[in-house]
């Protein structure tokens, strides 16, 4: 199928992919006067007297803003807010189709992190949650951190945490397949940008102790000649316990797990062959992964996952974000905290019984109807237990 041609036809048909639907038909004078003035004044008075009533009388409690400034859209780069709108519309479709969550695309003409932060704070009263999307690194870290601190609704950068949650779910199941424990394995993360950094942090929360991060200049280690900036300096302190230096070739020797969020071909078969027996690879560069599955298998890799739907073990964020927001909204959560993210990963992993796990079946499929509800239930429970649920 020619997806480029089909996408142009789909997007131009209506045009766009989403629309506003009225839940209050206005077919007569009474209906009009109830939905709008004068009747609408009464919900306004209720909310003024008790601000939490906004969840009772408006769409806030079931609606998420999908926010971008178009600076890091898919593999297209900094294409701007208008060109990013089809992607944000698509994200809203996935929220609704997979999680039953209403979502609104917000594409900001905002060049700086301060402008993005100010804009999101200004629109936040309308929404029950904020999904940040396709904002370049390192600004994405700072934007999310300030919004999480200052807003009383969940803020979630899916490029970071959605990917990290799915990877952890896959890792937990892959380790069962190969008979290893996360505390014992050597992990190499190649490409510590937004997703890679979040993956490292999720793995650490799950118990990983030996992680080495590698970028285009080599292993992250304090004082390296190529230098370290921003979040990478912090990562260098938090990872690489033996403080080794060098290239990916040095890092990968004897590794049990490789996680790539980098570029096509970064993990050659020759490098993969130096990994430990029964090694696991998540090669998530798109559209061409760091190593193709057939080459990985030839090099001795036991389990391999990619970001592609045409190979087994697809790492697909749609397994996470619809259910995460569905669960967070259901309890009016103030945050999506580490406990909720961990609960989501464990719920996704748990959908595949141990007796069905194998080298090509470590993650549920994107269209598995159980996923969103399982994730939502786990996230809601974790929100209650961690004290961020309002109801």
Where are these regions (language model features)?
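Short, acidic/small-residue loops that bind anionic groups at enzyme active sites
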Residues: 150-164, 281-286
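ADP-ribose/adenylate-binding Rossmann-like module
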Residues: 131-134, 257-311
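General beta-strand structural signal in soluble alpha/beta enzymes
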Residues: 105, 131-134, 155-158, 189, ...
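Glycine-rich phosphate/diphosphate-binding loop of Rossmann-like nucleotide-binding domains
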Residues: 74, 79-99, 157, 161, ...
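N-terminal ligand-binding/catalytic initiation module
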Residues: 1-155, 376, 381-382, 386-390
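Adenosine-phosphate binding glycine-rich loop
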Residues: 158-159, 178-180, 283-391
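A short, aliphatic-rich alpha-helical micro-motif
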Residues: 124, 182, 251-252, 272-275
